[in-house]
Structures are given as C-alpha cells and as structure tokens.
Amino acid sequence: MKEYFVYEIKNKEVYDDFIQYMLEHSDFFSVIYFRNRKDSPLNKYLKEYKKILRPYILHAENTRKWPNTETWNGRSVYRIAFYYADMKCYDVLTRVNDIFEWHYPRAPMDLCFYKNGYCWFALTAHEEMAYLYTNNEKEIQELRELGVMVEFSEDNARLFHYDLEKEMNHYRTKILNKKL
C-alpha cells in the first residue's frame, strides 16, 4: 500500500470538502476520547461529541494503540470509538476548522477513516501528522482537486487493521454470557 503525507488542508472550505469525501468513501471512522485518569470524567466538549455521535456507534474500547500512535502512559485513559461513516455525522465532524484541531481538550483526538477494515486516513493531531494509505491514484487525484495537499511518502506501508466485525461478535458473545 502506498503512503501519502498530508501536509496541508488550505482552509475551512477544503477541510469541509475533505470530510464529506472521507465520509462518502469510508465504511467507518474512529476518534479517541481522552481522560487524565480512570476516575476523571469526560470534559463538556467530549461529552457533547459523544452524545451527538451516539446513534452511529459501532464499538468502543479502552486502548493504548490506534493508527500511527502508541502510548505508554498507564495512568491516562484512551477510549477508541468507532462510528458508521454516515453523512449525518458531517455537521459534528466539521465543527473544527482543520484536521489538526482533532485534539484534547476541545475535541476528541485523532480522527481516522477506515475502508474494508483498514485505516486509510490516519491522524496524529498533536504531532501534526496525517497520512493517507491507498493504491488508488484516482482517490489521490480527487483529494488534490479538492485542495488537499499530499505527497507520496513510501511504498509498502504498514497498515492499521481493525476487525470490527470480530470485535462486535466478541462483544455480543460477552453480553449473551452475562445474561445466562
């Protein structure tokens, strides 16, 4: 798979077009809800995002690893939440002005998009690093035409895969076993 570095999304209009494109061409997306400690509540901004996105939730779990990020901080809580890529999510995903605003405390962290279980847009907002993973030159050209500035980074990039169906089946089994 080819990796492309996203080095600029010129303005809010381009950002909004990018979000629309990603929602239309992805199966699901993820964000990270951060808390300083297990006993810390989510802040008001994160609660609002979570409430608005609740109808589109697929799965959520605490994690230490997500696309292009791994944390060793054992005290903080990172909860990855996966949502259907539905155009009804457009308004909440375009509340921020730029991809690098997907960062605590004003928004959930690290918005990522997935296709066929693979992350094809990975964001590490606090490091201002964003990558697209695709072998489809047409997708890259369409994004460039929207004003997304990308450059080829490498061939044979390692991809983050999330088997959402497996996780959802595991979750269903866990709930059924609790009821027995």
Give the residues covered by each predicted segment.
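Structured alpha/beta or helical-core interaction and ligand-binding surfaces enriched in interleaved
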Residues: 1-180
